[in-house]
Amino acid sequence: MDLPGDSSPPGQPRLCRQPLTRALWGARSPKRPRLQLPGAPSPLEKASRRVLAVVLEDVMAVHMVPVVPSKQTSIPQHHSYHQDPVHRQPPASPPRQAGWSSQARPPDPLCLCREPLSRIHRTSSTLRRRSRTTPGPEEGPSQKVDRAPQPTLVVMLEDIASPRPPAEGFIDETPNFIIPAQRAEPMRIVRQPTPPPGDLEPPFQPSALPADPLESPPTAPDPALELPSTPPPSSLLRPRLSPWGLAPLFRSVRSKLESFADIFLTPNKTPQPPPPSPPMKLELKIAISEAEQSGAAEGTASVSPRPPIRQWRTQDHNTPALLPKPSLGRSYSCPDLGPPGPGTCTWPPAPPQPSRPRPRRHTVGGGEMARAPPPPRPCLRKEVFPLGGVGASPSLTTSCSSTASTSFSEPAEPRLGSTKGKEPRASKDQVLSEPETKTMGKVSRFRIRRTPARPQLNLTPMGLPRPIRLNKKEFSLEEIYTNKNYQSPTTRRTFETIFEEPRERNGTLIFTSSRKLRRAVEFRDSSLPRSRRPSRGVRAAGGRTVPPNVAPSPDVGPLLQQRLEELDALLLEEETVDREQPHWT
């Protein structure tokens, strides 16, 4: 099937175009058979390693080829891809895909196969020599602990030049190289071609692949590192990359593919059954205690702020812990409790409540019915403790270790819902002192006012208290003269008394003062009408007082009478003149 844009001759094998994203859903597609061993990585890991394979080498090929001595051939090192007319043809098998650049067009019949890197078990001493000794990006430090059952990545070099029939059924934009493979024993091999010395480029080798001297162009095969059934590294020839233009393309895309593979396509760890472990209980605490000491012996008691988990598991539960005094850790309020063996468990379970359970008041889940658990000690530290010995019960009230892990220190007063009569603790040094417990309070013990506080009525609008004035009418002389607000009257406020001390002025005795005082009142005659005071506006409008020389004299009447007579005479003259004028005309 001819793909669009395929310029290769019809007789030569074509390059199947396929995007890199097909590796993600194609690996999980039900139409494609999965060749995955029990120790093989997941399809997502294969897809991520397929992208990593594109980044690591320009034309690096990873192929899943079992080792069969009868079918494998070796090619000498000096053999070039221009001089190889005959290529081996492996049997057909389900195709495996990988991404290739859209600008890569091989001018000769060479099939470059890209398949995901994978890890296999070490089967021989030769594979152990080729196995990786340092963890790569896809192998975290957590895998160093269980190194024995983990598979190993084997990198081998082999010739990749072989003809293949044109693949059908893939119509995508990015070309993809597919080579079938089917052998007796499955074994994943990384193939890397070697270019001629004139066109040699230093390949990109991150820490994902081992720094093997075979990555550089070899000059002679190494018999100590080669299997007799696999081709020597001298037969691995790298095609010339200048007509394809792969080197500049991979240099530009390399950083993007690396970041994409590191972020999104980090392979998952091979699922393994977890080792059987005792039941663990997570405890929410605030301050993280100090780290456990690695050199602590098995039979000695812990002196750290809390007994380390190693001592909890290895220490004998029948030996009681002897603590002379509580050693406080970083929280300075948490005594050391020692291992929770049956000998040290002296805290009794919570007695049954005499009253019926009532719903909690100040909790997030307000509807839950809460019986009073054993009173928790106010030490809050984030720690992990196992649930106790062999025969310990995981319940809260019967398990000694769970009681020890949930309650660290006893408050001074019992809870409100529990009974008042509690057994005294076995060791008083493990209980907090009184000043420490008095500072600790519970929300349920805070008193809540059911009625609001009465507002004070004698406050000013600014909130200041108003002065309280007495309604008392009669005051004694002591109250008057001792009152801070009392002031003696000034000269203006002094009263004139009837009997006054006479003063002598100019040889005469003056019994009364001449100045007017406020107590001098003039009593008017009530029968006379009151004189109205003119308003200030009218007084201002008048504005001026009549001078006394312009005031009317007493002979105004005769003067007015004379003026009126003159006016009458003038009017009579005018009437007589009017009567004579029309007669003249």
UniProtKB/Swiss-Prot annotation:
Extract the ranges annotated as region (Required for the interaction with GRB2 and sufficient to promote the phosphorylation of AKT and cell proliferation).
85-378
- InterPro entries registered for this protein in UniProt: PRR14, Tantalus-like
According to the record, the residues making up region (Disordered) are: 23-46, 73-150, 189-241, 290-445, 525-557
In this chain, composition skew of type Low complexity spans 393-409
The record gives the effect of mutating E566K as: Increased binding to GRB2 and enhanced cell proliferation
Q: Enumerate the residue ranges of region (Required for nuclear lamina association).
A: 136-365
Chain spans, region Required for nuclear localization: 518-535
Coiled coil start-end: none
Q: Region labeled Sufficient for heterochromatin association in interphase and chromatin association in anaphase — which residues?
A: 1-135
Write one Pfam family the protein is assigned to.
Tantalus
| Pro residues: compositionally biased ranges | 193-205, 337-356
GO cellular component assignments: chromosome; nuclear lamina; nucleoplasm
Where does it localize?
Answer: Chromosome; Nucleus; Nucleus lamina; Nucleus, Nucleoplasm
Tell me, which GO biological process terms does this entry list? Answer: muscle organ development
Where in the sequence is Phosphoserine found? S277
Q: Which coarse location class describes where this protein primarily resides?
A: nucleus
Keyword list, A-Z: Acetylation, Chromosome, Myogenesis, Nucleus, Phosphoprotein
Q: Heme among the record's keywords?
A: no
Tell me, what does this protein do in biology?
Functions in tethering peripheral heterochromatin to the nuclear lamina during interphase, possibly through the interaction with heterochromatin protein CBX5/HP1 alpha. Might play a role in reattaching heterochromatin to the nuclear lamina at mitotic exit. Promotes myoblast differentiation during skeletal myogenesis, possibly by stimulating transcription factor MyoD activity via binding to CBX5/HP1 alpha. Involved in the positive regulation of the PI3K-Akt-mTOR signaling pathway and in promoting cell proliferation, possibly via binding to GRB2.
Q: What is this protein called?
A: Proline-rich protein 14
